[in-house]
Amino acid sequence: PQNFEQKIGFDSIRHLLKGKCLSTLGEERVDEMAFSEKYEEINERLEQVMEFIRIIQEEDEFPDQYFFDVRPSLKRIRIEGMYLDEQELFDLRRSLETIRDIVRFLTRTTEDEEMEESTSPYPALKRLAGDIIVFPQLITRINNILDKFGKIKDNASSELLRIRRELTSTTGSISRSLNAILRNAQSEGYVDKDVTPTMRDGRLVIPVAPGLKRKIKGIVHDESSTGKTVFIEPAEVVEANNRIRELEGEERREIIRILTDFSITVRPQVPAILQSYEFLAEIDFIRAKAQFAIQTNAIKPSLENKQVLDWRTAIHPLLQLSLAKHNKKVVPLDIELNYKQRILIISGPNAGGKSVCLKTVGLLQYMVQCGMPVPMHERSHIGIFSNIFIDIGDEQSIEDDLSTYSSHPVSYTHLRAHETVLDL
């Protein structure tokens, strides 16, 4: 049926996987996860997850800090005149460093003394990372622009360095002038001893009582909410404060120029960079599947390129998680179906577990063919089916039961019209 995933509970699996993703990159991959009937593809996906389980359990240095999705920003700068702002550039640098570090981690080799050659501890993941482009020159270029906190460096350009030096010099000059004026006003008793210069509307000013504001020549910029203080910009520093405003405008324009120039340089590389982020998305997705497998004690059973079920102690993962909250355990399931024994009839009383059994088979088989490990004994064998059909009604009331029963012949007709020996 069209609501097959809801019938077997796979929609809940997707939801749980999304919760384990580090970014929207991985979440999109969860949405795109699809059933496959190709043995090599399924086997490779399972191997990737099993290798990542080992990474989680055995490695402490896997680089997973910065899974930022900067694809929208990269796509935006394809348009002439658009540029990455400071935060976007910071996210780009950190995520590119993460991609670089992951590729290094997965493509490293160890010496095999018996084979007298170098081998990879994670061959399936190494194959995934093998052709991924990293961008060391781009990272270096960003490092020349941003400091370690993601702020534009003073020396990002010679012009910016000049502007910021003049800003520092002018601000220092204003502070010295204000302090001299303030000390004089304090000695005359116009201003309290504990008063210090403050900032109002981007200008350095002195707080003064309203009744004494004429004692200091200057411009009144603001007053406190209580009306007990006015903020005066002394006439001696007005011109210097104006220069500060001019320099701040120059600084903003120079930063935009730097960011625009960088974006122009990056623009031709955007398609290749986006491809590397697809790799980051895949790693996020595989990691989420590995985390879920660890949580549910899932393994990769012996995968066979034929239609067979030979499962030992198989467990419904959603039921397992639900019961674990109440310190209860699932009753495991053993089942065997093959080309000789192709039909299995399950009978029993109401609430005897028949529906759970059917859903367990459907869900676990679907999970495997979506590249997910499943909770069962490692000696289990699991095959591959072209299609999975299910006709199951959730019993809610007498009326619903009748309508559900009457729908069975329709479902059977559809099944008979489409089934093959390759289906479950």
Where are these regions (language model features)?
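N-terminal pre-Walker A segment at the start of P-loop NTPase domains
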Residues: R312-V331
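Divalent-cation
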Residues: L178-P210, K215-G218
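Conserved small/polar residues in nucleotide/adenosyl-binding loops
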Residues: T413-T420
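Charged, amphipathic alpha-helical linker segments immediately N-terminal to NTP-binding catalytic cores
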Residues: F292-L318
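Conserved amphipathic alpha-helical "coupling/scaffold" segments
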Residues: P1-N155, E159, I163, Q269-A272, ...
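Extended, charged alpha-helical coiled-coil/arm scaffolds that mediate oligomerization and mechanical coupling
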Residues: P72, Y122-K193, S224-F285
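P-loop NTPase nucleotide-binding module
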Residues: N327-S380
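P-loop NTPase switch/communication element
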Residues: Y366-S406
